């Protein structure tokens, strides 16, 4: 496995690739398993929830998503895992149905680290995709973080960046500057 360089929206050459319409993946593909492993390693190293192949310079219809595990605090203060991490590999994904209702979400992207803005997304989506073996799947009514991530990553496969979805550009902000501006408490 290898950590790949994530292309950046604010780099002119990278942006050309990020704006491309990605080509479908022809399955089976012996090299795809290694690419997917590299993508997961890259995404984890960047503390992301999703990553699309064009973000690492490969304009194909492939994206990965991993929803972090959820924990519940016990009376003794310990944590138990109530929902394990959910990794998804979506090859040639197509959103085939949407809720018809939008919600505004604060959204960021590994291709523009530290920047967030309010983006309208469907409350749920149904997506069809293939897995690494070429088997077809349908994920119905994906909502919450998973539904949001699917919409974000599928946008990447069509050359659409999250900044293009922002309706009110005044919501786009660099949270690293917000963090730097916060007062630091003295430690004893």
From Swiss-Prot:
The keyword Nucleus does not apply. Its EC number is 3.5.1.88. GO terms for molecular function: metal ion binding; peptide deformylase activity. It catalyses: N-terminal N-formyl-L-methionyl-[peptide] + H2O = N-terminal L-methionyl-[peptide] + formate. One of its GO terms (biological process) is translation. It comes from the Bacteria. It is an enzyme of class 3 (hydrolase). Keywords: Hydrolase, Iron, Metal-binding, Protein biosynthesis. NCBIfam families: pept_deformyl, PRK00150.1-3. Removes the formyl group from the N-terminal Met of newly synthesized proteins. Requires at least a dipeptide for an efficient rate of reaction. N-terminal L-methionine is a prerequisite for activity but the enzyme has broad specificity at other positions. Belongs to the polypeptide deformylase family. This is Peptide deformylase.
């Amino acid at each position: 496995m290898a950590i790949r360089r994530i292309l950046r929206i604010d780099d002119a050459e990278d942006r050309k690739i990020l704006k491309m319409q990605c080509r479908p993946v022809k399955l089976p593909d012996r090299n795809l398993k290694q690419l997917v492993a590299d993508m997961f390693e890259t995404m984890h190293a960047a503390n992301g929830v999703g990553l699309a192949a064009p973000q690492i310079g490969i304009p194909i219809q492939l994206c990965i998503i991993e929803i972090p595990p959820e924990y519940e605090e016990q009376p003794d203060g310990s944590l138990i895992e109530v929902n394990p991490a959910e990794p998804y590999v979506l090859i040639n994904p197509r959103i085939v149905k949407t809720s018809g209702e939008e919600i505004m979400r604060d959204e960021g992207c590994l291709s523009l680290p530290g920047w967030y803005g309010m983006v309208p997304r469907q409350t749920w989506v149904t997506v069809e995709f293939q897995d690494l073996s070429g088997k077809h799947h349908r994920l119905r009514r994906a909502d919450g973080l998973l539904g949001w991530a699917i919409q974000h990553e599928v946008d990447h496969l069509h050359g659409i960046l999250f900044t293009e979805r922002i309706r009110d550009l005044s919501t786009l902000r660099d949270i690293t500057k917000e963090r730097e501006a916060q007062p630091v408490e003295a430690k004893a």
